[in-house]
């Protein structure tokens, strides 16, 4: 495990490829989604993956922690003409939700650990029914899912837009002094 030896920076957005090219990463535009490329960087190797969690063009850059600040500075300088700005976890979280990327234990919990008594979240409730392969003749829950597909789901994961003051992240919302589900 080399986690404590590496630093990672995520560069996301429509100009991310142009920024990396300006930084000197030649042929970065040839990277396909989920590709990993390696580039020389101050006598070390910079690993770049064409990945991200925002639903936009994006890359993740990996370097030893000793060169992390230097990488940040060069990345920031290369992106200055593009209006590069640092962003945090909340912005990433909003972008991934807008892109429809859901996370286990954040947006839903697995059936065995669900917080609602006697309520297992199904793929149809989460908008993931298209992932269920009913061509497969036998799997646990197949009959229940076929029934739900035919009759519809009782619950559905929805996006809620709130204008004005927003509730805190992971806040419980109340209606008539009762916790909403």
Feature roles, as predicted:
Residues 1-181:
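Conserved, structured C-terminal
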């Amino acid at each position: 495990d080399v986690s404590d030896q590496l630093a990672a920076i995520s560069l996301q957005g429509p100009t991310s490829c142009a920024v990396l090219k300006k930084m000197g990463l030649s042929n970065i535009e040839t990277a396909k989604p989920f590709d990993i490329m390696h580039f020389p960087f101050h006598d070390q190797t910079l690993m770049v993956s064409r990945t991200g969690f925002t639903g936009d063009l994006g890359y993740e850059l990996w370097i030893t922690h000793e060169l992390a600040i230097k990488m940040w500075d060069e990345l920031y300088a290369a992106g200055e003409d593009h209006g590069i700005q640092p962003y945090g976890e909340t912005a990433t979280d909003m972008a991934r939700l807008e892109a429809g990327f859901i996370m286990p234990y954040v947006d839903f919990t697995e059936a065995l650990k669900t917080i609602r008594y006697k309520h297992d979240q199904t793929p149809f409730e989460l908008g993931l029914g298209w992932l269920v392969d009913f061509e497969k003749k036998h799997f646990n829950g197949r009959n229940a899912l076929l029934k739900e597909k035919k009759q519809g789901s009782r619950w559905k994961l929805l996006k809620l837009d709130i204008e004005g003051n927003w509730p805190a992240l992971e806040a419980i919302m109340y209606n008539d002094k009762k916790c909403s589900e």
